[in-house]
């Protein structure tokens, strides 16, 4: 066939009628047909994504917070911040085709700041439960950068994949909660010349997966080695929530506030009149950097929510009100044995008082309840007692419960 007679095998246009004509074994395709084929494939992919997204009904921020309210007592501001951040995160994913090219919506990873036992992990867990997305928890203190003894950051993603039943597409829209994130702060503000195995190096390793990358995950876990096969997962749509107590950061915030409010018109409250939460609500990225988080890592967590220490009243509500309240759980378990158990108001207050003494927030409630209920759940079904009331006496003597004491209190 002469050059003049060469035609596109698909549309029949001659070489002169098109910009390019690509030759294959016995066939030719023009640039316009290549573009058309590309557009068809793109459209089909887009339709598949839209079908996938239609299955996921994105709840509004109010609905998300209402669900959180059923499990998490208090923390109103944190729940509101988290609800909006999560809504925007998934809206960014599922409405991607409607976002104009000149706008780029940043990923809204979340940093939760608050003392131990105030509900940081529970908030993240409850969100994943409500949205029906895969969820994984990691402890930042067990992570090390590549080449050191410890856990690779990619193992976090392996847990997420496992919890998604090895469905990579589902895992790519999951939620990862990284606890104790403050424990990997570097030891000083200045970048260290020597290696910081548990601090800056881990932040750098996490940074890659948090900001969005194609990560290579070893399917068996453990360390990577050159001869194993990897699972590839795109992390750009995974929501990362990090939590930590950041003990001492309030001093950094106070120092900055005191300096910036010196002079005419200063309206800062005296230190003794400001609560820890009031101080922490003024946290800015520079405070986190001074604490020891690297600027790039701080920049990848644009949403910051501060959780308040739990008051006695809040602990009392946590004990009795949520769907998963400990009192409700133990009542349900004993009712299966035909035992009706009740707690006096004074007994509940005693449990809270004992939990406060442990200084571990809501975790203290579980510790006290487990100590109290161990012998009750062991003895009551065996004694044939059908109705029992827990009193403060029993709470304070929970490690000395005997059959005689139970019979006496039941009688």
Curated annotation (Swiss-Prot):
Segments passing through the bilayer: none
GO cellular component terms, A-Z: HslUV protease complex
BP terms from Gene Ontology: cell division; proteolysis involved in protein catabolic process
Keyword Zinc: yes
One Pfam family matching this protein: zf-C4_ClpX
Keywords (A to Z) from UniProt: ATP-binding, Chaperone, Metal-binding, Nucleotide-binding, Zinc
Positions of the ClpX-type ZB domain: 1-49
SUPFAM superfamilies: Glucocorticoid receptor-like (DNA-binding domain) (SSF57716), P-loop containing nucleoside triphosphate hydrolases (SSF52540)
Alphabetized InterPro entries for the sequence: AAA+_ATPase (IPR003593), ATP-dep_Clp_protease_ClpX (IPR050052), ATPase_AAA_core (IPR003959), Clp_ATPase_C (IPR019489), Clp_protease_ATP-bd_su_ClpX (IPR004487), ClpX_bact (IPR046425), P-loop_NTPase (IPR027417), Znf_CppX_C4 (IPR010603)
Binding site for ATP: 115-122
Binding site residues for Zn(2+): 8, 11, 30, 33
GO MF entries: ATP binding; ATP hydrolysis activity; ATP-dependent protein folding chaperone; protein dimerization activity; unfolded protein binding; zinc ion binding
Gene3D superfamilies: 1.10.8.60, ClpX chaperone, C4-type zinc finger domain, P-loop containing nucleotide triphosphate hydrolases
NCBIfam families associated with the record: clpX, PRK05342.1
Annotated family: Belongs to the ClpX chaperone family.
Functional summary from the UniProt entry: ATP-dependent specificity component of the Clp protease. It directs the protease to specific substrates. Can perform chaperone functions in the absence of ClpP.
Quaternary organization: Component of the ClpX-ClpP complex. Forms a hexameric ring that, in the presence of ATP, binds to fourteen ClpP subunits assembled into a disk-like structure with a central cavity, resembling the structure of eukaryotic proteasomes.
Protein name per the record: ATP-dependent Clp protease ATP-binding subunit ClpX
The organism of origin for this protein: Dictyoglomus turgidum (strain DSM 6724 / Z-1310)
Gene: clpX
